Design a protein with these regions (language model features):
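A short, flexible beta-alpha/helix-coil linker loop
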Residues: 36-37, 132-134, 178
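Short, conserved beta-strand edge motifs with alternating hydrophobic and charged residues
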Residues: 69-71, 120, 126, 174
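ATP-dependent adenylation/nucleotidyltransferase module used to activate substrates
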Residues: 1-112, 171, 188-199, 207-225
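Peripheral terminal appendages
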Residues: 140-225
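Mid-to-C-terminal catalytic subdomains of enzymes
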Residues: 97, 101, 107-163, 205
Length: 225
């Protein structure tokens, strides 16, 4: 099993996977993938994920021989995933897709094997996904996003979708609709932004992938269209 570290990966995610690997005896490789050395990635085009996954898979290939399998599931094929193009170019296999397994089934499998906190873990796309297309990816910005989300999540509940977006207008907090008018959330977000010299411009209903501007509807991997 390979886990990538970079400024785009929340430190809590790395701690979690290390803890599980130690507990269950997984053969875990942890390494940086170097996407921040790639100017194409940092420029944050709409297909940024293509350059991220290209660096990721090339890094894994430099460390191991044999087949590389991703954790892509069938639900991922219905979303904009330029990283799947990078996977197809490198003959990465997608066993969950081949088996017709979607995200809910992955969660059910985790429950069956006693991995209950993983089964209930909210979706955690990389921190770079919070940055609006065309705004350069900066490690300091991603650390800010991580701090904001970790600080605000307890206010609305850890299972509630919450995103800190970096937009051209300023900082936007997205949260499930029932929490948009939460006064404690607004107070906390305003205070944190002021502490970090950022401008909070809006708290609005969560919209998946809203930071991607100009994205096509679907990008599927070769052999899995």
């Amino acid at each position: 099993m390979f886990h990538a570290t970079s400024p785009a990966v929340p430190p809590s995610a790395t701690l979690r996977v290390r803890r599980y690997a130690e507990l269950h005896g997984w053969n875990l490789l942890v390494a940086g993938t170097g996407e921040f050395s790639d100017a194409r990635y940092r420029a944050n085009p709409v297909d940024r994920c293509y350059f991220c996954k290209s660096n990721l898979y090339d890094r894994i290939r430099s460390m191991i021989q044999g087949t590389i399998a991703s954790g892509t599931n069938t639900d991922d094929l219905a979303d904009y995933r330029p990283g799947l193009t990078a996977a197809g170019e490198r003959a990465i296999v997608h066993p969950l897709v081949d088996a017709g397994i979607d995200k809910s089934t992955v969660r059910a499998i985790a429950r069956k094997y006693g991995l209950h906190d993983l089964a209930e873990l909210p979706a955690q796309p990389c921190l770079a996904s919070r940055v609006e297309t065309g705004i350069a990816i900066d490690a300091g910005d991603l650390a800010f996003v991580d701090r904001m989300e970790n600080s605000l999540a307890p206010i609305v509940g850890l299972q509630t979708p919450l995103r800190c977006r970096i937009t051209r207008r300023g900082i936007v907090i997205e949260v499930s609709a029932e929490h948009v008018d939460n006064s404690n959330l607004r107070e906390g977000a305003t205070r944190l932004c002021a502490e970090m010299k950022r401008s909070l411009v809006d708290i609005r209903a969560y919209e998946r992938g809203s930071a991607f501007v100009g994205k096509p509807s679907v990008v599927s991997a070769p052999d899995h269209a």
